[in-house]
Amino acid sequence: MECQRCPASARNPATVESRKEKFCDECFIKFVSTKQRKQMMKDEYFRNLFKVIYPFEKEGSVSKILLPLSLSDSGSLVMLDIVHDLLLEQTKQHNNRTGFTVDVLTVFTEENVSVIKERMESLINEKMSQLNKISNIFNVHFIDVNEFFNNASEVSTFIIDNENFEIFSKSKSVDDSNILTLKEILGKYCLNNSSRSDLISIIKTQLIKHFAYENGYNAIMWGHSMTKLSEVIISLVVKGKGSQIATFLDSESFDTLNNKPCKYKNLYPMKDLLSVEIESFLQIRNLAQFLINVEETNVKPNCLIARKSLPSLGQQKLVKNMTINEITNKYFQDIQNDYSNIISTVSRTADKLTQPKSSMAKPSQCQICQSKIYTNPSNWLNRITVTSPYPVETTEEKYLFKQWQDSKLGQSHTHYVELLNEIKQGASNSLDVEDGDVKLCYGCLILLNTSIKDKNLVWPKVDTMDITANATNNNKELSQILDQFEINSDGEE
């Protein structure tokens, strides 16, 4: 088989087959890179961010771009590789000048800090040091996921009244004796893997957006492929957060954080690429060596002709043990080679969605996920749900009720009622219609009601958070990492 994009007089052997077209390695790399660069030049705002602007002395001629890098995600790594090549081209064409600088941000946990340290050393030496010998183009930042809790001066305890779905909250100050951790939140409050996955995703996204807001970036480049975006879109619908889709995909408006306007826009440069194409690019460019889950990455589906691979049966989870995100991921991974049109249909349809009309008296944002709230979820649930139990009457019913009270489930309910009454005493009802202060969106309300122990959750107050400009300085070990791998204009380590 021959590449269909090479000149007819010198066709190379085909190594990749995607979208019913055959590519050699060189043509496929160009195909993927062109798709990403096209999105980076999608409108005037982004064109001005990424192109070299003359004169160089003009204020704002060099843009600041934040690139969240997950070393367990192929998309963000491939995106960084293509951005690196673009910057290298600009330095050659414009006398060592570039139109933008890139700050790479990695959010880590205690469990993976050592392997991230090792992989980042290799990545910095191979992909960033060369350009930083010319100019200070790349900067690297690390944030401990627990900074989400450490940097809040206040936390709120949210609880749902299961009789009418009203939400009550109680705030308290944070000091060194009662700082929360991710491990504590996931272990103490979450009842299943789906709720753990949701909270981790919310925390990481908020850390990245706070970092961008506080450090004045012009754009955040997310490494979501078309497949990944479709997974997120369907997951949002399933979780009751479909109203967030339009905002999530919005690359035309400046973002908002805690009802405050931001100076950056969100960009998805990989949105025209399937995840199998990204995995194939990763293998061709030998980038898997930088990921912390190399073995898992090597068995992911791709569109390489000679090296197609599928997960073995031993690696597959039972559906009942999978999170919502994992179920949607499995579905789209299974169909993308043969039915990629389904994925593109989901993505294109979502792009056409607009934000719902709000029925709120004033703009409100969810205190957990920071999404916009368009209607009062508690009122709607109260209208369609019967929560009053049937009264206990017969001797048998009284006996069974007593057994239930003595069970773990009954004791848990008793603890929930006591906690609800305690919070109610000093808390104002969040559903005051005139005040319009609705604290949770529908999706987070359902999460709290069904997947969180005792229907209550302690969460940092976003308006009291302060993710510092140099987050790594808050952690001694990672400060040492940055010192060791510091990349500067002289190219010295």
From Swiss-Prot:
Domain of life where this protein originates: Eukaryota
GO terms classed as biological process: protein urmylation; tRNA thio-modification; tRNA wobble position uridine thiolation; tRNA wobble uridine modification
Major location (coarse): cytoplasm
Residues with Phosphoserine modification: 489
Gene3D superfamilies, per database record: HUPs
One GO cellular component term: cytosol
GO molecular function: nucleotidyltransferase activity; sulfurtransferase activity; tRNA binding
Subcellular location: Cytoplasm
Keyword line: Cytoplasm, Phosphoprotein, tRNA processing
Covalent S-S links between cysteines: none
Keyword field contains Transport: no
Classification via InterPro entries: CTU2, Rossmann-like_a/b/a_fold
Pathway connected to this protein: tRNA modification; 5-methoxycarbonylmethyl-2-thiouridine-tRNA biosynthesis
Known partners and oligomeric status: Interacts with NCS6 and URM1. May act by forming a heterodimer with NCS6.
Function: Plays a central role in 2-thiolation of mcm(5)S(2)U at tRNA wobble positions of tRNA(Lys), tRNA(Glu) and tRNA(Gln). May act by forming a heterodimer with NCS6 that ligates sulfur from thiocarboxylated URM1 onto the uridine of tRNAs at wobble position. Prior mcm(5) tRNA modification by the elongator complex is required for 2-thiolation. May also be involved in protein urmylation.
Family: Belongs to the CTU2/NCS2 family.
Protein name: Cytoplasmic tRNA 2-thiolation protein 2
Organism this protein belongs to: Saccharomyces cerevisiae (strain AWRI1631) (Baker's yeast)
Underlying gene: NCS2
